[in-house]
Amino acid sequence: MGNGTRLGRVRGLGSSHHGSHHWLQQRLTALGNVLLVTWLLVSLLRLPLDDHAAVHRWASNPTVALALILLVISVFWHFRLGLQVLIEDYVHGEAMRLLAIVALNFYAIGGAAYGIFAIVRIALVPVAGVPGGM
C-alpha cells in the first residue's frame, strides 16, 4: 500500500496515545482538588474567622502552606487541562488555536505563580500586633 491509496495517505495520522494520559491527568488533579478543598473547608470551619491573627498563624504553618501551594498548583493544572481540551475541540484555525493555547498557558502559569507568591508571603511575613492588619 503506497502513498497513492487512501490508507497510505492516513497512515501515521492515527491516535498518538496522548489522550489517555491527558484524561488520567485530569482525573488525578480532580481527585487532588476534592481532597485538598475538603481539607481546606474543614480547616477553615475550625478556625475563628473573626480573628485575623489566628488565620494568619494557621496559614503560616509550613504544613498548611505546603498544602495550600499544592491546592493552587492542582487547581490551575486542572483548569489548564480542561480548557485545553475545549480549545483543541472548538477553536478552528491553527493560528488561533495556537494563540489561545499560548494565552491559556501564560494565564495558568501566571495565576499559579501569583497564588504561590501570596501563600509564601503570608507564611513568611510575621503578624503585626495591630488587630486586623499586617
Descriptions of predicted regions:
Residues 1-134:
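Membrane-embedded alpha-helical bundles that constitute the cytochrome b-like, heme-associated redox core
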